[in-house]
Amino acid sequence: MCVRLARNLFKTSDFIPCRRVILAVSGGSDSLALMFLVKEYLETLLIPPEIIAVTVDHQLRKESAREAEIVAEICRDHHIKHITVRWEGKKPKTHLAFSARIARYDLLVQEAQKQGASLIMTGHTLNDQVETYQMRCQRLQKRRGALRDEVGAMCDGGAASGFAGALRDKAGARRDEDYVRETRKNIAEKSYGVLYERGLSCIPREALLHRKVRLIRPLLGVQRQTLRNYLRLQGKTWIDDPTNEDRNFERVRVRQSLSSQKLVNIAQKINKAAWQRRQQAQNIADLILALDITVQYGRCFIVKPAPFLQKHSCFPFVVGLFAVLMGGGFYLLSNQKLSMLVQKLCLNSPEKRRFTCAGCVIEYNKEGIALWRERRNMKEALVEPDETLLWDGRYRITNHGSEAIKVGVANLEQLKSLLQNSNSNLEKPHFPSLQSLLMLSNDKGCDIPELISQAIIHKNVIIKRIMAPFDWLSSREDAALVNVVEPFFNLEVKR
């Protein structure tokens, strides 16, 4: 039974190419079962990777240090390498579970890079998956009524009236008004589904952490009780975390409300939602490829698409996606913000219009849509030698030099001076977007690496443009979408 269970959980591709695999082992039943199942499976391979069990001591409970020692003893008995890493420093008073999760994965990635491991595995189970679904579903349902009210307003024509006014002096204004109303009704109703389904796909089996290390959760289809039965058959015991019974936590309350039958029913819904998310990611990717989009010098431009592309249910999602990426946002637009974007977008208006969304300026006219970073909250910062800084949610700067680097944005005078004294071939510079580009400066002058090909004042610096919503963790379900968008932001400057 044990060997059969192990073979059903893993794919050969999970461990290719992989010299070492990090297993997150807390000592609980799920993670211990993962460790022993991986060990059994790897024994069937000709050239198995090395297992390294890593325990993250969050230092939130006095028992945590001893629990890490117990895991180390278990690993020693089974000839498995074990490492304990600790979440140091002051802990936040609010959103503790969220912060602990971020810290835990960051520590695992750091240890993976230190050990030369390209894969991390965690012991998330079907129970975790179903609990996540229930919590997200409850939150989304609270917002559903408000969003439906907004969609209803669009259907009644209220939201379209502002745009109809812009067309009142044009021939065929009535026809255009009907077109605008129908387009926005169509988009609003369908785009709601895009975000709603994305959230309910829950925990992906495979993801990418920090765009470097694979994260696989092979136990997502297995119930916790099955894993505990497996451990009992082998005579293994595990550590029970008392917080797993603390009803002050939402997850515990949800867990205790779930019956076995409910578990099975929700699992089917999750599988459907995951499939829908993959399909939607592909639909969004196909739409992006069909559109004429350029990203250059801090400005994104979407050429006005054909009417059938404007009416595509994913079109506002695409505009919102590029707004977030240009604005340096860490999260894709919520249902509410996407609905607001739908209300503001109307490419049939003959007048130039401008508004802000997700830290980004969106300007549209008869030619198309332009997006660039809004000029606010772009703070200056110092990058000390041998340090890496994520700046404005858009750039990751690594300083390999001997002096600190000042980062920020250029004022208009600095920008004009740089353009005049450089070999830049910009015929019609768009200064608002150019003023959002990363600038390096010191007492000797300033340098905008994205604009100027040769270093003026700084060397031994690596600058990479990032996509913040997908930078820390990127789900396999979104692979089609990420693969299409990434080339637009594939900027890396090494000096």
UniProtKB/Swiss-Prot annotation:
**Single GO MF descriptor:** tRNA(Ile)-lysidine synthase activity
**EC number per UniProt:** 6.3.4.19
Q: Which GO terms describe its cellular component?
A: cytoplasm
Give the chief site where it resides: cytoplasm
Q: Quick one: a GO biological-process term for this protein?
A: tRNA modification
Could you name the domain of life of the organism this protein comes from?
Answer: Bacteria
| Enzyme class, UniProt record, top EC level | ligase
Alphabetical UniProt keywords: ATP-binding, Cytoplasm, Ligase, Nucleotide-binding, tRNA processing
Instruction: List the catalysed reactions.
Output: cytidine(34) in tRNA(Ile2) + L-lysine + ATP = lysidine(34) in tRNA(Ile2) + AMP + diphosphate + H(+)
Homology family: Belongs to the tRNA(Ile)-lysidine synthase family.
Swiss-Prot/TrEMBL domain comment: The N-terminal region contains the highly conserved SGGXDS motif, predicted to be a P-loop motif involved in ATP binding.
- Name of the featured protein: tRNA(Ile)-lysidine synthase
Q: Which gene encodes it?
A: tilS
